[in-house]
Amino acid sequence: PEGVTRIDVPTSMAWSITRIVLSGEEDLPNVYAIQGKMKLMPLSDYISGDTYEPPRGSYSEENDYIPVDKVLSMDPITFFNKANELMVKNSPAAADKEMLEKIAAVNIGPGMEFDTSVLTGDVAENWKTMLTEIQLKLIKEGQKFSKKLGQWDYFGEPIGDFNTEYAYRALVALAGLGANTVEVALYPKIEQDADGNTLTGEKSYILHFESYPQVLEGGFWSVTAYGDDDFLIDNPINRYLSLIHI
């Protein structure tokens, strides 16, 4: 239809991330108004103009969890069978053909039942050890995709469109579920000052730009301070970022 942008999604599961700029507490009514105009509906209802009533959700304690913690707490049988189930609903890409042929040897693939005979010894302890080791390996593997922007570091291509870079994909999924491609957004990070000392809230810093970072028309850049846990830092002036619109 006119005025509608078509986006093809190759899987049955998808998600949408939307950012709305908030310029302070007095700006909340504007944000609420924008949120009130957001709707998710079948295309047929949009075209017909009929009023669409979305199905009401329900709370389930079973689904009340932090996704990454849930995955990391799974035993190997649960993990691989859940992957097999999800691959039925979300078909692997054509580029995954070679990998699928390899892992099919232990019954990992769409609709399969994981071959538990490959699990030997102390399964729980071996799985726990492997998870620890593989996370360290993923971090190491991810470094080859790290790029420099002055003193800042960011993860570069093929982030957001990983193709067969499975380790890179897993690292991003572990740390943040998903990521934009570099054409859409960059997330440079810095942890040391100009002298190589670790940044700390006990000191004051000056961030100097020769010129503002270039962005496309309508874009923006911001500077945000995060703690060691990668969450925002509570502070007495209630300041969480500096935002510049272009």
What are these model-derived regions, one by one?
Residues P1-I244:
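A compositional/structural signature for long, glycine/proline-rich flexible linkers
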